[in-house]
Amino acid sequence: MDLFAIILLFLPHCAVLTEIPYNWLNLAVLRASDYQPRTDHWRGRQVYEALCKRLQGLTPHQQALCQQHPAAIPFVAKGVREALLQCQQQFQFDRWNCSSRDEVTEGPHGPFQDILGRTFRSTTREAAYLAAISSASIVHSITKGCTTGNLTECGCDSKPNLQRYAIEEDILGGQRRQRANIEQFSWGGCSDNVPYGVKFARKFLDEWEQEQFNKTKDVSHLVRKHNHFVGREAIAQNVRKQCRCHGVSGSCEFRTCWLQMPKFVEVAEMLKKRYEHFAVQVTKRAKKRLRRKDRAERGTPLRGNEMAYVQRSPSYCERNDTIGILGTSGRECKHGSYESDSCDLLCCGRGFNTRIETRTQQCHCKFVWCCEVKCEQCIEDVAVHTCK
């Protein structure tokens, strides 16, 4: 049996049809992300198309794109799962830690989990980050599938000279060094096909948002579309040109170069900095493009590194099931810290409880030639602080 035929077993039919919201983040919890596509199977495309019809939370545009590129959907699912993991990693010490109380409803093809749904459909700064990193995750995952050959409808970039790149590095004797000058080189190896990933992500996310804005004039669609662009640009603007030197005794007489996108954890970190320092509040109304709320800068278009939001964020201090906020009660904090993980900030002035836990940790680590680090296991009593 084809692996994707197995997925259908996890999407049982339901007698009662329930209208479910559009939220493609639901792909993160489907078994589709666990499997590699098998395009060599004669029934492969039929199985994928049947799966597309039963995936819940996709917009009509996403359903159509799934039908056209069914083998790409597992990579989208893997990408959004990685996006959510990185989101939780980047915000683990913030009041909003990229988690929420998700509603589970019975849809036409089984239970539907509305992952971060209220945040996903809002226009806060947190929603901006979520839109940006999920968009970037599609670009990264699809591009990686092209480069590795696991996604057969694309391959390496045949015209890397048309891509932008920010950093140039040489690989020489296993070492990497950033170059300060430009020398002759030839394109070789397998350059990451970022343009293909960007194009797919734009189709998957933006076409429906633009169509809905044209119909409803709801600015939230333009906000999400812009933040999707910010996520894509975080990858496209940070592609690296990497080169391998050839010559006698590493003289680097000639170089072979290729383009490589940044690691996804680097993208997540870049987007977190843009969330913290380059988030711009925009007006609630727009004709064709977003406008800054600050009247003095209203004529300045939003840049590709600026996230857009409309609503001010709630405090996230207290639990509020109505809007899906978990609150910070019970969260572990650091006493004496001056960062966002400090007990003063994370506990919102409510104070904290302290308990002593016995933990096993690595200690007395030593470097052993060559090339290993050996550590002992130490049992320590640790003071753990949690918010009241």
Description of each model-found segment:
Residues 2, 15-345, 349-388:
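Long, position-biased, composition-driven segments near the start of the mature protein
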Residues 1-11:
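Classical eukaryotic N-terminal signal peptides for Sec-dependent ER targeting/secretion
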